[in-house]
Amino acid sequence: MHRNQAGPVICSLLSLLAFAVAAAAEPAGSPARLAGPRNAEADAATYDRCLKLAKQNPGAAQSLAQTWHERGGAHPADHCAAVALFGLKRYKEAATRLEALAQAMTTAPAGLRADVFDQAGQAWLLAGDPVRAYAAAGQALGLQPNDPELLLDRAEAAAAVGYYDKAVADLDHVLKTDPKRTEALIYRASANRALDRLDAALADVEKALSQAPNSVPGLLERGNIRRLNGDLSGARADWERIGQLAPGTQADMAAKANIERLDLKARPPPASTSRGQ
């Protein structure tokens, strides 16, 4: 179950409107307020430029964010600095900064703070700390209860920790609102497979693939379930299909590794030889 990859997730961040709200929310004693009236349009342009730079040259974006922070950029500058750290694959530092930022934004709208906690959770996952990721996702949901995107992210963190029942519970909530959500069906299938609930897992993934027949995650998951059910030819067919749809991807590499394991098990043992015969 892998919802978020290291690339674009955290860089599709806050809108400029959210930036304006966060900047306006600075307390009276903050550097932004002490620096005197700010040009909101100029700050919005700096924020936009900083986020774009974080995708292209995160080191330069980090320098820009630091300079901007020293000049009173406050929360938006801190946010861009965290994005730059993410781009540099310094995920633990990015997660720490995002978490601190979300906690500091006490006067910002709940939805904005929830987004930043959620981004911290994504960074914690990539830092290899799913327990912190799960906690951050929980803080996000405390601010924005029942948000389906936040529930999906917490379900991923729960599965990474091994809390498969909790992952299923979050995904149940998502699917009550949107029973046809393919992504959630596949994630729930994965969690149920881990719980050895293979009938439920297969039902979910079959429904997902009936809606999206070329879903690579769905095919990978159904192959896993079919293998556990003893349907080795069906598993092979699903994994080979991934090679046609998404050659060279991580999913394709995982599928090829699964096929190799099938082939190894299918090979007869080498004939034994006895000396002197």
Describe the residue ranges of each PLM region.
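N-terminal leader/linker segments that initiate helical-solenoid repeat arrays
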Residues: 22-80, 84, 88-96, 268-277
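Terminal, low-structured helical/coil segments at or just beyond the last alpha-helical repeat
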Residues: 31-34, 38, 234-277
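Helix-start (N-cap) detector for alpha-helical repeat units in TPR-like alpha-solenoids
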Residues: 43, 75-76, 109, 114, ...
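Residue-level recognition of tetratricopeptide repeat
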Residues: 50-51, 83, 122, 156, ...
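Register position in tetratricopeptide repeats
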Residues: 55, 87-88, 122, 126-127, ...
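Structural marker of alpha-solenoid helical repeat scaffolds
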Residues: 70-71, 104-108, 143, 177, ...
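Canonical tetratricopeptide repeat
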Residues: 80, 119, 153, 187, ...
